[in-house]
UniProtKB/Swiss-Prot annotation:
One of its GO terms (cellular component) is plasma membrane. Gene3D superfamilies: Hydantoin permease. Thiamine-regulated, high affinity import carrier of pyridoxine, pyridoxal and pyridoxamine. One of its GO terms (molecular function) is transmembrane transporter activity. This is Vitamin B6 transporter TPN1. InterPro entries: NCS1 (IPR012681), Pur-cyt_permease (IPR001248), Pur-cyt_permease_Fcy2/21/22 (IPR026030). Keywords: Membrane, Transmembrane, Transmembrane helix, Transport. It is found in: Membrane. Belongs to the purine-cytosine permease (2.A.39) family.
């Protein structure tokens, strides 16, 4: 018995030593290590190339020394995570700051201003759709603590090693699209309060650069800054409710555009519904990123509720205010002029205008809500880029944050005079892919990881002896019954875990699914998008049945199409390949 204890102690010491080595490796920075290797290989290269590589290696070491997060898409193991209850408060502050800002409000403005809906019509459409979007984002977030992986890394268990790159690309477009919108809005606000002394392009540069300076440092700093920003930002929005209240009598003066027939109004209502759904559902592509430091056994219900209420309450708080301001602008000429001249920034300044200098100060505070939203977008987009190839994964995250910032800045400068067009026509497309991703994840967890776990013979290979960890018996038909028995034992041993994944295999190409079923279901879902979308450049045959401009139902059709196709395809895939 003493010998067994000695063996156990030795294994623990070896495991601890290995863990220490891994942590030290990441603290030194994977980027610097990669560049040092490249330096050795470049000894025979031209001197200019050697100097460039040496300079890059020196820069990488300097950046790591500043405390910049050097880890990329690597999984955070359970023993590397925190256990403090303050994590819940920090993440709650993050959601307050990120979702309770002008990026959320901007879409609500379009109900009256673009779609011609009354305040009541816009309110009903937006609240229902935002609730659905928050439910989807909250469900996606539960993958964070159990996996220790970024959201798009967990998608490898659905789409496989290769096809997940397409999903990562969609995620990049989504979060960077919002960053472009935020940068333009920030520029409009600074131009409005300065009477155009600060040009629009200068304001865009200021917002973009400020976002980058925080996002480059890593998740711990991002969460801290977001928490600190949430208090002044939400206070400023509360003051805007008060300052603009003297004009609320104009809200009901505007009913809806009289030249819209009943069918067209319904179509516009549906399109606005889809737009507001995208505001919160899009968070589903990155929500898990901010729970990877939570303990592995954190109850799912806690993560779900924290994400749902953390996104729902702030979004509704600023969204309803946006509807009030937009409805006033439709019937109150001075505010309408401000919106036509300076866009959303002018409308916000109009709401604060009676407070003069203090009102301008409040507008500047609101700009920080755009910065806080961009911080999250820039931080998470870098991981999706790393997921696109092995080469990109070797390049440090902070470098890709720089690339994302440059792309965002260029796109914002080019599209700065087409804000409503970008927001109304492009961003709803983001909700299409997240709808399909959600339904596939939901079915994978609810059906296959619950009732067909014995078919995952690659992920859970044959072992003998005591069940310890995620390893299960059952890699062939002869031992399938034993596999089912052992799975039941494992579930009783780990009662907290509802969905079974072998997260240690997150980068094992031989174990991860091929992704044939998910990819095929995704493609079928795209067919639903084509027939159901209503945008300026395309109105699908089903969407065209709702009035002159159509009604966007692409999210729901794509979700339905993918959800019907995936189960039979996934079952066949598991039977054929065991993964």
């Amino acid at each position: 018995m003493n010998r067994d204890n000695m063996d156990t102690t030795k294994r623990k010491e070896d495991h601890t030593k290995h863990t220490t080595d891994v942590i030290e490796f990441y603290e030194e920075g994977t980027a610097a290590s990669s560049l040092n290797i490249a330096t050795e290989k470049a000894n025979s290269s031209p001197s200019i190339l050697r100097r460039i590589i040496n300079r890059a290696a020196w820069l990488s070491k300097k950046v790591d020394a500043m405390g910049v997060e050097s880890t990329g898409i690597q999984r955070i193991s359970p023993y590397e995570r925190g256990t403090s209850k303050k994590q819940f408060l920090h993440v709650a502050g993050l959601w307050l700051s990120a979702t309770g800002g002008l990026s959320s409000m901007s879409s609500f403005l379009l109900g009256p201003l673009l779609f011609g809906l009354s305040f009541r019509e816009s309110l009903a459409s937006s609240l229902i759709s935002v609730t659905i979007g928050c439910l989807i984002a909250a469900y996606c977030s539960i993958m964070g603590p159990q996996s220790g992986c970024r959201q798009m890394v967990t998608a490898r268990y659905l789409f496989g090693w290769w096809f997940v790159k397409l999903v990562a690309l969609a995620s990049i477009i989504g979060v960077m699209g919002w960053s472009v919108v935020n940068s333009v809005v920030g520029g409009e606000m600074l131009a409005a309060i300065s009477n155009d002394k600060v040009p629009l392009w200068v304001g865009i540069v200021i917002v973009t650069v400020c976002s980058f300076l925080v996002a480059i440092f890593g998740i711990k700093q991002v969460i801290k800054v977001e928490t600190y920003l949430s208090v002044p930002v939400l206070t400023a929005f509360l003051l805007l409710y008060i300052s603009s209240s003297d004009k609320y009598s104009f809200v009901n003066a505007y009913v809806s555009k009289g030249n819209l027939d009943s069918s067209t109004r319904k179509g516009n209502w549906m399109s606005f519904f889809s737009l507001c759904y995208s505001i919160t559902a899009t968070w589903g592509s990155i929500t898990a990123d901010y729970y990877i430091l939570f303990p592995e056994d954190t109850p799912y219900i806690q993560i779900f509720c924290l994400t749902f209420f953390g996104t729902f309450l702030p979004t509704c708080f600023v969204g309803i205010l946006g509807l009030l301001l937009a409805s006033v602008a439709m019937s109150y000429k001075p505010w309408s002029v401000e919106y036509d001249s300076h866009g959303m920034g002018g409308l916000l300044w109009a709401g604060f205008q009676r407070w003069n200098g203090f009102g301008k100060f409040c507008v500047v505070v609101l700009v920080f809500s755009l910065v806080s939203n961009n911080i999250i977008n820039t931080y998470s987009a870098a991981f999706s880029i790393q997921l696109s190839s092995v080469f990109c994964a070797k390049i440090p995250r902070w470098f890709w944050s720089i690339v994302c910032t440059i792309i965002c800045l260029v796109c914002a400068l080019i599209g700065r005079n087409h804000f409503s067009t970008i927001l109304g026509n492009f961003l709803p497309m983001i909700g299409y892919w997240i709808s399909m991703y959600f339904i596939l994840l939901f079915e994978e967890n609810l059906v296959f990881r619950r009732f067909f776990l014995h078919l995952y013979t690659k992920e859970f290979p044959t072992v003998t002896g005591e069940i310890n960890g995620p390893e299960l018996v059952g890699s062939s038909k002869e031992v399938e019954k034993d596999a089912v028995t052992n799975i039941h034992l494992l579930k009783r041993k780990h009662k907290v875990t509802k969905h079974r994944y072998n997260w240690d295999k997150w980068e094992d190409y031989e174990v991860l699914t091929h992704g044939y079923a998910a990819t095929f279901a995704f493609i079928v879902g795209v067919a639903g998008v084509v027939v159901g979308m209503a945008q300026a450049y395309w109105i699908g045959p089903i969407a065209a049945k709702f009035g002159e401009y159509g009604g966007d139902v692409a999210m729901w059709l794509s979700m339905a199409f993918s959800g019907v196709v995936y189960p039979p395809c996934r079952y066949l895939e598991l039977r054929k390949f065991g993964r």
